[in-house]
């Protein structure tokens, strides 16, 4: 019997995790990853690797919670497994502060969620009017991408370094196409609902920082955050929709450092390791995860538009892609 062929387009955390999960759950499929950018040059590489739904739009928030739950459970597994050291996966506890009361739907997914009292706010960040404490997971995304690629190749996955102009170029060679191109979908399939949300972060050496701290003001974006990663503390950040600038902006750098030092004064003398900027793939209408019919009856499964929640949703979305493929294609291939 001929093996059905799958091509996953895109090699960030969404693309690689999707390819690996297809291999895991559909072992009779031949899987290829095709991309023109690989780690360490993907947007995912600069991510803080922090699990929390962030800058993800749309009305399908029930699915965001479902995908987020599946991903968080998987990350908790990695953080408590022997793989934790290799992946920089760790459970982290800390505070999220706000300028007004919040009731996030994801509060039931994290561990130990509680609203903080006025004493904690006054002691830690008096400018805030509301706060919460909880435990979540962080992962070193560069290490994670390397591990995913190793797993993919070990499972006989094919890797092609190339750029395509349209998905239809792949229909002759592949039975299933999975579109994980992120911001690239704007040009590749003419989806102008995909827009960049520019993110800039600074990484510093601050091994004394053990708790994360975030602050969200009235603009609706996380104005500043401090995330204690495995190799550095990540300071952020920006959420500039429609900004295509991939250079490090000095004003943003100043805002990040000053804002984070206000939250945690001990960072004032921390050594700066590097600055980074990336463009998050945001869709106002929400994550696009659905199938579409192409020429000759071939189907593409779209999986893009995760905004600032790529790490937060990746494994759950990969599982949804597998379900889409299994439902749409298994009956057809039984006749080959």
What are these regions (language model features)?
Residues 2-14:
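Beta1/beta-strand and adjacent pyrophosphate-binding region of the FAD-binding site
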Residues 17, 171-258, 262-271:
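Flavin-dependent oxidoreductases
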Residues 23-45:
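Glycine-rich FAD pyrophosphate-binding loop
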Residues 49-128:
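Dinucleotide-binding Rossmann-like beta1-alpha1 core, especially the glycine-rich loop
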Residues 59-71, 131-147, 247-252, 312-313:
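Short beta-strand to alpha-helix junction loop
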Residues 87-92, 159, 265-278:
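A short coil-to-beta-strand element that immediately follows conserved catalytic motifs
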Residues 121-176, 180, 185, 315:
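Helical element adjacent to the flavin cofactor pocket in flavoenzyme catalytic cores
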Residues 147, 270-336:
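C-terminal catalytic lobe of FAD-dependent flavoproteins
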